[in-house]
């Protein structure tokens, strides 16, 4: 019996065959299935759960070509057995404009909620955990099913970052990263975003983190405030991005005073030192080291 059911997105025959070619060296391990419907719909995840018979499920979230490195799937199986994780995801390379660049991902932490958390395009699931998670989803989704599944799995299992470069993505979305970061405010994505919010709300209720939207009117005229607003940045090990984040705040022009609060969660990669360099800035920067 083969150990992995691979579900590959099918757009057209040429594209699909390119994806299948990545698994030519792993035919003894994998069953390959064509996936013609969106991976982000509940019906699709239910279909996968019904069809999967192997111990593990491999999903690709992109329809573009990739290259699996030597014994990549054997390594994922080994780590899945060792960790008993519900989901494994790995560091990888990307080829952009004919150049190969490193694309490391980060550890999944308790409380991670971002619907655009970067797992890379290869997701490796424990089949039993996958099936239980899918059948426990409370409502049907057209866009947020995979997000809701990941949140569900995180409540009961480990989601493990494999700190090894196991594959290479052929990147075809050449927009600048800043353009991608603000996809969520695009009006065309409004329905998708509403679904993500519903999935997140269900998760927060499940973990006891949901706060009812009950508000008390506050009269801000009763007490004078030296600072009208605060920008708060929670951070851990973001040496490559924290400088840009601070600079974006420093460049804001207002007719009122505001401060910047950086909550540093035990960074050990040089992030703390970069934050401290800005303590003398005219802007009030408060560095809280948890």
Put a short name on every predicted segment.
Residues 11-15, 38-39, 61, 65-66, ...:
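A conserved acidic beta->alpha catalytic loop
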Residues 100-127:
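A recurrent flexible, glycine/aromatic-enriched loop bordering the glycosyltransferase active site
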Residues 18-32, 247-257:
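Short, acidic, metal-binding catalytic loop of nucleotide-sugar glycosyltransferases
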Residues 4-13, 230-241, 245, 252-253, ...:
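A conserved hydrophobic helix/loop-capping motif in glycosyltransferases and polysaccharide synthases
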Residues 57:
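Short aromatic/hydrophobic "clamp" motif used to bind/position activated sugar donors
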């Amino acid at each position: 019996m083969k150990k992995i059911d691979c579900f590959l997105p099918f757009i057209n025959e040429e594209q699909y065959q390119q994806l299948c070619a990545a698994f030519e060296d792993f035919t003894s391990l994998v069953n390959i299935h064509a996936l013609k419907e969106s991976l982000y719909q509940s019906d699709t995840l239910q279909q996968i759960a019904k069809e999967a018979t192997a111990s593990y499920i491999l999903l690709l979230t992109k329809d573009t070509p990739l290259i699996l490195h030597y014994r990549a799937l054997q390594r994922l199986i080994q780590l899945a057995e060792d960790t008993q994780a519900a989901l494994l995801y790995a560091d990888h390379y990307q080829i952009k404009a004919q150049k190969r660049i490193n694309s490391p991902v980060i550890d999944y932490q308790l409380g991670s909620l971002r619907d655009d958390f970067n797992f890379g395009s290869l997701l490796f699931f424990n089949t039993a955990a996958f099936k239980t998670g899918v059948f426990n989803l409370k409502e049907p989704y057209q866009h947020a099913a995979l997000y809701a599944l990941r949140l569900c799995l995180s409540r009961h299992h480990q989601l493990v970052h494999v700190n090894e470069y196991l594959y290479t993505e052929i990147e075809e979305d050449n927009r600048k990263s800043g353009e991608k970061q603000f996809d969520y405010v695009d009006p065309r994505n409004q329905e998708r975003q509403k679904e993500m919010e519903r999935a997140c709300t269900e998760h927060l209720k499940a973990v006891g983190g949901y706060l009812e939207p009950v508000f008390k009117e506050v009269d801000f005229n009763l007490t004078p405030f030296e600072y009208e607003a605060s920008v708060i940045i929670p951070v851990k090990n973001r040496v490559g991005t924290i400088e840009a984040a601070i600079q974006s705040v420093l460049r804001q022009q207002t007719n009122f005073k505001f401060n910047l609060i950086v909550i540093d969660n035990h960074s050990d990669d040089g992030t703390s030192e970069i934050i401290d360099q800005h303590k003398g800035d005219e802007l009030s920067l408060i560095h809280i080291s948890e």
